[in-house]
Amino acid sequence: MSQTAYRTHHATEVTEALVGQKVTLAGWVDRRRDHGGVAFIDLRDSTGLVQVVIYDEDMARPLRSEFVIQITGEVRLRPDGNENTHLATGKIEVVAETIEILAKSDALPFQVSTALENESENKLPGEDVRLKYRYLDLRRPSMQHNLKLRSDMAKAARHALEDMDFTEVETPTFIKSTPEGARDFVVPARLVPGSWYALPQSPQLLKQLLMVSGVERYYQLARCYRDEDFRADRQPEFTQLDMEMAYVDQEDVMAMTEKVIAAIWKSAGYEVQLPLPRITWKDAMDKYGSDKPDLRFGNPLVELTEYFKNTPFRVFQAPYVGAVVFKGGAATPRRQFDAWQDWARQRGAKGLAYVVFGENGELKGPVAKNLSDEERNGLREAVGAEEGDAVFFAAGSRESAQLLLGAVRVELASREGLLDPKKFAFTWVVDFPLFKPTDDPDDDDVAVGHSKWTSMHHPFTMPSKDWIDKFDKDPEHAMSDSYDIVCNGEEMGGGSVRIHRDDIQARVLDVLGITKEEADEKFGFLLEAFKYGAPPHAGLALGWDRTVSILAGADSIRDVIAFPKAGGGRDPLTGAPAPISDEQRAETGVDYDPDADEN
């Protein structure tokens, strides 16, 4: 790193090669230790720590945690036995000759010392406090690492895409409101009272226009905005690595994306074996109870619908019955099985049926007595369980029961310590339905259109070749040319082949219950562009916050965003959202009433 007015070196640049030389350093006082008239300061900057030795008590006396200081001194080897093998600079120290306090610090609301990094996270305050003082929270080395990792990943992605002849293009932030599956954030247009801009949920339509414009390979790290109910894994504003290509099909996009992912992971020291595995959407739901399956461990779901087709147990007289094995679960106390019932109810289920296989194959548990002798005798073999195991069941509609069992599968793996954050299990999920029911209780997306069907991905997704001529005759079974990339049970991104023919687009909109007049009003500009020769095109977007959090092994995407929002979209740091003044309301026209002008 280059020398500046305040330093000759960064902390971790001070090595054995500089022993006997004078250096000037600048940074924060990470912590201070006093030993018999000698003070030791850990000086911290963005690169790490270096130990400073101060023999002058008057020089050391005013120094406190998080004071910003500049020190000049000579580098020397630490005395034998005093090396710190955990530090990059653990073999040397700097003997201070001069120290200047550049800025003082008040008492901290919480400690950010590197010395606490390897201790329990319980040392940290609640997340609201961390977010209120985010500038302090970001001083912690783990947070600095995440921000640096995010930057390095972006650099690797850019290099990979530019090597494949992609062009980075910035698309507008103020656009017209268009249907994309969530609520828009809107901004008043001061110069056009009563009119509003929308912040883009994605650059979807704009990047399609770029394909029509002749930009055959486009990308950007795009800021996106969605006004949806807050969930732990969502942010109202987020970033995605957006990519689109002309004259390509699904295979081309998937191959390109794999190269980008491999380059990103390589930048962090990991090798990704290509090509990545694939699974169909149906198989993912049937085997893992999720359209974003975690493949770091096995234990697939077992369908028992046929097995229980003549069951006397009314709960299992359902369209779907499935199970997941709880290895060694027979030793689980009854109170823990009761806690599983609460866990299931928190997810909207009525409960979680179970049996246990005791010694000598004896079947126990609340469900056992409700089964026929034939069902009890063959159950262990049917589910692949062993003596000492337990089995959880779910029955009901196929999707809701599978989703519950999929959540059980992951929760069991978590409790068994099988979710290694340093192991990365990628898979493509392909062959998605084109549409989904509008009234799906397990879906929180905003329906696009006014019919019983809404888009599984978005209204501009191309039907698969086998369905182009008939998707509007059988929307329930129609399939699409779409694909998601999944890692460790998280959806990293998704994409599709886009509709480039206005006749197909019109039929899709008709299935969604969007009239021609409504389509022209909301995105007529795209339909108009298609009339002038739109090339076949396809693309994909990676959720950047999610992708970084997976590679960082972070518990939350908020740990890889510099200034994230808390629950409900609140910003404890700045106090946003906040009321605006009466003057601002009048100036921006948020209360504009067109009827008042007529009167």
Curated annotation (Swiss-Prot):
Domain of life according to the entry: Bacteria
Positions contributing to L-aspartate binding: 180, 226, 457, 498
Keyword Hydrolase: no
Keywords for the protein's UniProt record, in alphabetical order: Aminoacyl-tRNA synthetase, ATP-binding, Cytoplasm, Ligase, Nucleotide-binding, Protein biosynthesis
GO cellular component: a single term: cytoplasm
UniProt KW Protein biosynthesis keyword: yes
Reactions the enzyme catalyzes: tRNA(Asx) + L-aspartate + ATP = L-aspartyl-tRNA(Asx) + AMP + diphosphate
Compositional bias (Acidic residues): 590-599
Compartment annotation: Cytoplasm
One GO-annotated biological process of the protein: aspartyl-tRNA aminoacylation
Disordered: annotated span: 565-599
Span list, region Aspartate: 204-207
Subunit structure: Homodimer.
Main function: Aspartyl-tRNA synthetase with relaxed tRNA specificity since it is able to aspartylate not only its cognate tRNA(Asp) but also tRNA(Asn). Reaction proceeds in two steps: L-aspartate is first activated by ATP to form Asp-AMP and then transferred to the acceptor end of tRNA(Asp/Asn).
Family: Belongs to the class-II aminoacyl-tRNA synthetase family. Type 1 subfamily.
Annotated protein name in UniProt: Aspartate--tRNA(Asp/Asn) ligase
Species, as recorded: Bifidobacterium longum (strain DJO10A)
Underlying gene: aspS
